[in-house]
Structure formats: structure tokens, C-alpha cells
């Protein structure tokens, strides 16, 4: 059975992974928000905010879980499986496969991405190596 809501949600996340996510950033106090063309002033300090692409570290801040795929000798982190939604639907971003996988009840949906402009996989790799050291 196909769940259109699940399919749309998975596709939107795959598009975000492929294209990157824009955020408004205050260069004065480092506040980050979703872009709002009607209000570009920082809610914290009032300075003008600029639009930038979210980086991998910012993306992983909202991750619910990260599973790492590593070589048997533990010397190569080959990719990560990142839980980005849980409880209905459950959605994973798999950087090894370039795939977003969603599950909701008995339904499932997948969508692929071929680019990682935010550097999510590199940020996950940095987290893995930091935890191992």
C-alpha cells in the first residue's frame, strides 16, 4: 500500500539532502532561522541576517539517532544512517546508499539523493572519529 503523505515527506527530505537547506544567519550572534524574506532582522540582537546554506553540523543537531557503517578493522567510516523523524513516520537518511527511507505502519517509501552540499556525511564522520578518540 502506498501512503502519499509518506512518499511526499521522504521526497522532500531527499530534495533537501540533494539541494541543501537555506537558513538565515546572524553574523553578529550566530542565531540561525528558516529564511523569512519579510523579516531579515535577528530576533536576538536586531542585526541584519544573511541567507546561507545549512552545514552538516547544523543538520545533525536535530538528528534523533545516528548509526555508523564502518569497516571491520574500524579504520574506515563508510557512511551513516541518520534518523530524522520518529513515531509516525520513521525516516532515515542513508549516506552510504544516497537514499532516504521512510516507514509508517505497513507502508514504506524511498527517494534518492546524489549530492551532499551541506556536508552531512562529513559531519557524521567527524562525530564518529571524535567519539572514537
Regions found by a protein language model. Give the residues of each.
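Amphipathic, interaction-prone secondary-structure segments
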Residues: 61-97
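Short cysteine/histidine-rich metal-coordination sites, predominantly Zn2+-binding motifs
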Residues: 41-48, 56-63
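Short cysteine-rich clusters marking metal-coordination/redox-active sites
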Residues: 24-29, 42-45
